[in-house]
Amino acid sequence: MRERQAIEMNDDSWKPRKVVIVGAGAVGSTFAYALAQAGLADEIALHGANRELALGQVLDLAHGQAFFPSVQIREAQAADYADARLIVITAGVRQRPGESRLALLQRNVQIIHDIIDEIVLQNSTAVILIVSNPVDVLTYVAHKRSGWPRGRIIGSGTVLDSARFRHLLSQHFGVDVHNVHAYILGEHGDSEFAAWSMTNMGGMPIEQFCRQCAKCDDWTAARRRLTEQVKHSAYHIIDYKGTTSFAVGLALTQIAAAILRNQHGVLTVSSVLEGEYGLSGVSLGIPCILSQRGVEKVLEVALPADELEALAKSAAVLRQAIAEIHLPLNPSRKPDASEPPRATNNEDRPDGRQPSGVHA
């Protein structure tokens, strides 16, 4: 039995769980730390446009290897795309003073184009996770640019928003967050909405729980307040410390776990829709089953009419943003294989608001 296990471990078909992170700023490095701490990867390769920053992050993380589960941490090379299991793109640029939202979008689209072109050139079989903002638009851009099946290109979507929602509900009702089940759907931005029809406390529908809770006089007003707090919660963090990083790093680790461990977990990642909910030509946050192949299935939840309308409105906002992109979405160039991966680390607000606002 031991001999058979040894043969299987030495089989050339065995692939390490390599994760390449493109972007070495606050989010990329925090995710690398959380990923290493979780013991999800055998190799973590980190790249940043500012090479000195990237090398500093790698060295700082490597000095902690004695305290992590076994993992190799190093600087990424273009060839790492080829055999990576997961490629996480956090790279992006911040808005310049006086710069329009559309101009910012155009610059980030170009960055995604360059990175995707290089990944495709390496014949990668990885799943790509987009974190750069506006995440839903850039997920759609990456999907179109790569020509890959939609399941292999996903965005971080509303996973973090949903976690914030659960936290706020936990605080409001005095229930442990692990017993709160709730989702934010749609755009990772101002048009997102709370799926109250899917919200429950330990299996009890929220409306039923609320009647027994009696913690507030006006549940309708409380619902509005909680939804707005989700949308604006990151502003408070940015006002205090200038950036968000910890919660988004943990959210990305949750997504990575579903993929690297083939968990078939349900998370509200951003996925390109192909007729689900009557929508197509757009990517947004919706419940999806995630496995080692990426999105296995987009779940079509039986949403009530008002939530279906909110989802359609969110999709319309994103379609308008996609329509404003002036760069070609389909593959148009073959980059030089000798080029190193390109990225920026101006990702201090990578979970920043989508086209309809600014949020992290």
Where are these regions (language model features)?
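Rossmann-like NAD(P)(H) cofactor-binding subdomain of soluble oxidoreductases
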Residues: 101-167
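C-terminal substrate-binding/catalytic lobe of Rossmann-fold NAD(P)-dependent dehydrogenases
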Residues: 146-152, 162-339, 358-360
